[in-house]
């Protein structure tokens, strides 16, 4: 009885992992197909436009929960609570340049 429960749990886990992997593959944009050799300029222009769009999609900035006003207030509270601890060497990296 216990063995069949373990097999069932493992099969459900495997199914969930496959579903997550499959959804992750479909969520990422596909790279445009490169034109054939000797392609006309119109086809090259269309390819470069699609390539530029693809690069813009995969390199765009993603805005998340840190941009909401609620987290700004909680960030201030978190900073004050960590600085009030004696001997705390908490360093914030917000001022460093992003590469």
Curated annotation (Swiss-Prot):
PROSITE patterns named among the record's database cross-references: PANCREATIC_HORMONE_1, PANCREATIC_HORMONE_2
CDD domains: PAH
Keyword Secreted: yes
Residues with the Tyrosine amide modification: 63
Signal peptide start and end residues: 1-27
Tree of life domain: Eukaryota
InterPro entries: Pancreatic_hormone-like, Pancreatic_hormone-like_CS
This protein's UniProt keywords: Amidation, Cleavage on pair of basic residues, Hormone, Neuropeptide, Secreted, Signal
Subcellular localization(s) per the UniProt record: Secreted
Pfam family, one: Hormone_3
GO cellular component: extracellular space
Chain positions listed as propeptide in the UniProt record: 65-99
GO molecular function: neuropeptide hormone activity; neuropeptide Y receptor binding
Subcellular location, principal: secreted
GO biological-process terms attached to the record: feeding behavior; neuropeptide signaling pathway
Family, as annotated: Belongs to the NPY family.
Role, per record: Gastrointestinal hormone and neuropeptide.
Protein name, per record: Peptide YY-like
Designated gene of the protein: pyy
């Amino acid at each position: 009885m216990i063995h069949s429960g373990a097999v069932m749990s493992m099969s459900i886990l495997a199914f969930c992992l496959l579903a997550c992997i499959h959804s992750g593959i479909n969520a990422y944009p596909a790279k445009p197909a490169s034109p054939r050799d000797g392609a006309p300029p119109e086809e090259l222009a269309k390819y470069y436009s699609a390539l530029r769009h693809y690069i813009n999609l995969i390199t765009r900035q993603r805005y998340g929960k840190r941009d909401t006003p609620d987290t700004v207030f909680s960030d201030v509270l978190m900073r004050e609570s960590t600085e009030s601890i004696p001997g705390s060497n908490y360093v914030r990296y917000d001022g460093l340049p992003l590469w």
